[in-house]
Amino acid sequence: MNDKKLYISDVTLRDGMHAIRHQYSLENVRQVAKALDDARVDSIEVAHGDGLQGSSFNYGFGAHSDLEWIEAAADVVKHAKIATLLLPGIGTIHDLKNAWQAGARVVRVATHCTEADVSAQHIQYARELGMDTVGFLMMSHMTTPENLAKQAKLMEGYGATCIYVVDSGGAMNMSDIRDRFRALKAVLKPETQTGIHAHHNLSLGVANSIAAVEEGCDRIDASLAGMGAGAGNAPLEVFIAAADKLGWQHGTDLYALMDAADDLVRPLQDRPVRVDRETLALGYAGVYSSFLRHCETAAARYGLSAVDILVELGKRRMVGGQEDMIVDVALDLRNNK
């Protein structure tokens, strides 16, 4: 690792939405965004957990609109860029333009790891707007490193200047991460950046992020207190402490991040964001982390174990966007009891 500065991308106000069913108040957003900005992170992602226009029956309704959340963050931020997430098929280019007008300057266009071809229009439009445009390959554990690299190359061709390996299921280990970054680096242009988005379901969020940086990764997603889907993301303050120990340049204030994690974020959790029986099952079965709260609801409704539902979803290789299948699986399990 040379002396390059890592790009620290906070996702507390987007992935963290999943942990509290998309119920951040505008004041929560202002407080967290200001604390992150004061700690000098590079970008702060703000949106419904499932991206622009994710507020819906399928994914869960948000306490506010994406634009209200983005405007609230943009109002208090002086240093960091406001980022947002867009999943083609949920959000449109019109939603992206509205987000840009509200203050978003970075967009991560997210697709399933084998479906990069649906991102062309959105990536091209983001570039036309002048946004920092990132390709985000979700559930990256579900395809081979070589296939992932081909998908990354497509996104690069559409205009993305950074491509992310996204461990949405928190299912990968350090070797899996290394293999994918080596495959991406072998085909992407030298100037195209790479990023890592880890989940902590196997307690490897920080270790996987470190492995990614050792393979040349430029941008690291993390969240305060790990606030995110499943067992959460790589905890930002923990990653920064580890990076500091390694002598890496990150430009952030560790103690300010520690304070924000414990004083602002942990008190908001109505269900602890941690590795436990259910979230470990997510990582072990390779299931989309944001299925957690939906599965727990279905388990309570139908008198089942959430772990049984999660394991069955893993066997059926369900992916993000198939939240409606959780109830189907629960009914199948109940009927087969």
Swiss-Prot record:
Entry's Gene Ontology molecular function annotations: 2-isopropylmalate synthase activity; 4-hydroxy-2-oxovalerate aldolase activity; manganese ion binding
Metabolic or biological pathway: Aromatic compound metabolism; 3-phenylpropanoate degradation
Pyruvate carboxyltransferase domain mapped to chain residues: 6-258
SUPFAM superfamilies according to UniProt: Aldolase, post-HMGL domain-like
One of the GO BP terms on file: 3-phenylpropionate catabolic process
EC number(s) per entry: 4.1.3.39
Reaction it catalyzes: (S)-4-hydroxy-2-oxopentanoate = acetaldehyde + pyruvate
Metal-binding recorded as keyword: yes
Binding annotation for Mn(2+): 15, 197, 199
Catalytic site: 18
UniProt entry tagged with the keyword tRNA processing: no
Site residues by UniProt (Transition state stabilizer): 14
Pfam families attached to this UniProt entry: DmpG_comm, HMGL-like
Key words, A-Z: Aromatic hydrocarbons catabolism, Lyase, Manganese, Metal-binding
Binding partners and assembly: Interacts with MhpF.
Function: Catalyzes the retro-aldol cleavage of 4-hydroxy-2-oxopentanoate to pyruvate and acetaldehyde. Is involved in the meta-cleavage pathway for the degradation of aromatic compounds.
Family label: Belongs to the 4-hydroxy-2-oxovalerate aldolase family.
Full protein name: 4-hydroxy-2-oxovalerate aldolase
Organism: Escherichia coli (strain SMS-3-5 / SECEC)
Taxonomic lineage of the native organism: Bacteria, Pseudomonadati, Pseudomonadota, Gammaproteobacteria, Enterobacterales
